[in-house]
């Protein structure tokens, strides 16, 4: 019995690491690794993609990709074998979620139809004007307009619209080109108008608006005027 006890003790002293020194492996999540490797990169979310080892990084108005294994960032679009731009689809989905929460009370309201149409527009944008002609002929929508001026001239026209005593009529005049060709505009000194424009620009930045027109209709985003697709959606 003593001999057996001595043998066991010898084994414990000879191989202590196998019994007491079990190594603990720390697993670092992709999120933690990204924050450590790229501390200056702000983001809203990091989520896995359908590609193993590749994660989508959403900044709030842009999407790029991160590979934790190689600790690198990739810029560009993911395209499926069917030619579908996966990156664009994801971006539109995230944009739709944000547009659904827009404060419509700060927008210019036109019409009283049952279907809500939200638009970011520039009054000098050709396709914005084409869209206005399309929507102004319908009685089944309510249009909520957020302004996104792409030039000083557009900004002046927007202020003229918001300063007007008859906002709807002035908006109609602008969209029908009656104030084009550098037509003189009355001065607008209303500070509330300036604040409204700043609010619209801030909201556009948060959503990721880069061009006009941009529409939100029945949960879908259209980054351009697509009359056939919009017509079909409104009929559904």
Regions found by a protein language model. Give the residues of each.
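Bacterial N-terminal signal peptides that target proteins for export
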Residues: 1-8
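Extracytoplasmic thiol/disulfide redox context detector
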Residues: 5, 19-159, 173-176, 184-212, ...
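Conserved, helical-rich catalytic subdomain that frames metal- and/or nucleotide-binding sites
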Residues: 165-172
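Bacterial N-terminal signal peptides
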Residues: 8-16
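Extended basic-aromatic, gly/pro-enriched interface segments that bind polyanionic ligands
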Residues: 179
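Short, hinge-like loop/turn segments at secondary-structure boundaries
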Residues: 160-164
């Amino acid at each position: 019995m003593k001999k057996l006890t001595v043998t066991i003790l010898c084994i414990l002293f000879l191989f202590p690491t196998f019994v007491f020194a079990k190594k603990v492996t720390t697993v670092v999540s992709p999120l933690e690794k990204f924050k450590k490797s790229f501390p200056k990169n702000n983001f809203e979310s990091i989520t896995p993609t359908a590609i193993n080892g590749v994660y989508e990084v959403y900044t709030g108005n842009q999407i790029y990709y991160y590979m934790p294994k190689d600790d690198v960032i990739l810029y560009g679009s993911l395209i499926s074998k069917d030619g579908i731009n996966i990156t664009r689809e994801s971006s539109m989905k995230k944009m739709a979620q944000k547009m659904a929460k827009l404060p419509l009370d700060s927008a210019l309201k036109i019409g009283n139809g049952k279907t809500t149409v939200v638009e970011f527009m520039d009054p000098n944008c050709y396709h914005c004007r084409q869209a206005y002609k399309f929507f102004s002929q319908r009685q089944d929508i309510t249009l909520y307009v957020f302004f996104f001026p792409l030039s000083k001239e557009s900004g002046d026209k927007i202020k003229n619209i918001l300063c007007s005593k008859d906002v709807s009529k002035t908006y109609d005049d602008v969209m029908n080109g009656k104030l084009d060709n550098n037509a003189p505009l009355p001065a607008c000194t209303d500070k509330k108008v300036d604040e409204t424009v700043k609010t619209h620009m801030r909201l556009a930045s948060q959503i990721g608006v880069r061009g006009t027109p941009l529409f939100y209709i029945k949960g879908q985003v259209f980054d351009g005027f697509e009359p056939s697709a919009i017509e079909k959606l409104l009929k559904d």
